[in-house]
Amino acid sequence: MSEYSLFTSESVSEGHPDKIADQISDAVLDAIIAEDKYARVACETLVKTGVAIIAGEVSTSAWVDLEDIVRNVILDIGYNSSDVGFDGATCGVMNIIGKQSVDIAQGVDRSKPEDQGAGDQGLMFGYASNETDVLMPAPITFSHQLVQRQAEARKSGLLPWLRPDAKSQVTCRYENGKVVGVDAIVLSTQHNPDVSYKDLREGVMELIVKHVIPAHLLHKDTQFHINPTGNFIIGGPVGDCGLTGRKIIVDTYGGMARHGGGAFSGKDPSKVDRSAAYAGRYVAKNIVAAGLAERCEIQVSYAIGVAQPMSISLNTFGTGKLSDDKIIKLVRDNFDLRPYAITTMLDLLHPMYQATAAYGHFGRTPVEMTIGDDTFTAFTWEKTDRADALRAAAGL
């Protein structure tokens, strides 16, 4: 639910330059974790016309073919020809990854794993609300679904003139905290030069927008802005430079919840920017799934080298069945939010991260994956397997 009468969120496709960078960073992380699950990885990526640069710090015994990883990500997204503005097969790849600082390592590593310190200071937020089936805000959920559908229509050949870069934006109308309508939809998609605007608009409206947005939420005054500038032929890294970590609101809750500022992609689970944000989502989602509140935002903070959180705060915005203080006690009693405990609780030491790097880290479906000999569940932070225990502990 929302205290707003109107709320807008945006998303971007896997072919957006910043998302290319995120996916490359997480593909590097996955490749290293697949060989050395205790590796320390911080990988940043920059993509621009004809070049991809990876930089950062890594501590690992593994060897991976970084250039091959970078090229495969770009090609899999669909940038496979100079005709679309970028070609993963021929672009330059520059690697300037170095070793992790020993000063950071001594603050994180411990002889007893459960005493592992946080990889940095910082504050992280988790959020959930009951306004959608996936316990996410509706505007960001619809925005993700639009660009996901754009990619499906492009890759399947349903709309063969689509190109990889795309952005979406959805404005939802709320009454008494519930979504009652969609007032505006913006969808900008890169396309081939030979498609007419009439055909593009018709195809996008019928096969993307109407496929995603529930008909009962559309009304006579809903505004549809499909490629509002007219042409969107030049896109991807030619049109804009892409950087890891530039879409942190797209990655999370579309602005409906607060954000601590730390990006996710390219970071192994010892970095609480990522793992504690996942844990925050897990806690908040289980609170809402348990019926303890209709809406919940949790904040956790850490100090570098210290295992225990500095603080745990929580707000149910007046929707809680219990006081926020009592729910915080339930959180402390049922969730261990030390870094190592989070990694264990959510089973994070697997090569699952490239799958998170487009279309949002939250509101996804837990899915079993097999990479090499490793079979695991991705998106474990979306499980509601502690809801019953929370409900029982609350006496509901």
From Swiss-Prot:
K(+) binds at E44. It comes from the Bacteria. GO terms for biological process: one-carbon metabolic process; S-adenosylmethionine biosynthetic process. It catalyses: L-methionine + ATP + H2O = S-adenosyl-L-methionine + phosphate + diphosphate. GO terms for molecular function: ATP binding; magnesium ion binding; methionine adenosyltransferase activity. ATP binds at H16, D165, A166, K167, D240, R246, K247, A263, K267. Binds 2 divalent ions per subunit. Binds 1 potassium ion per subunit. GO terms for cellular component: cytoplasm. Pfam families: S-AdoMet_synt_C, S-AdoMet_synt_M, S-AdoMet_synt_N. Keywords: ATP-binding, Cytoplasm, Magnesium, Metal-binding, Nucleotide-binding, One-carbon metabolism, Potassium, Transferase. Residues 100-110 are annotated as: Flexible loop. Its EC number is 2.5.1.6. Its cofactor is Mg(2+); K(+). L-methionine binds at E57, Q100, D240, K271. It is found in: Cytoplasm. Mg(2+) binds at D18. Gene3D superfamilies: 3.30.300.10. Pathway: Amino-acid biosynthesis; S-adenosyl-L-methionine biosynthesis; S-adenosyl-L-methionine from L-methionine: step 1/1. Homotetramer; dimer of dimers. Catalyzes the formation of S-adenosylmethionine (AdoMet) from methionine and ATP. The overall synthetic reaction is composed of two sequential steps, AdoMet formation and the subsequent tripolyphosphate hydrolysis which occurs prior to release of AdoMet from the enzyme. HAMAP family: S_AdoMet_synth1. Belongs to the AdoMet synthase family. This is S-adenosylmethionine synthase. The lineage of its organism: Bacteria, Pseudomonadati, Pseudomonadota, Gammaproteobacteria, Pseudomonadales.
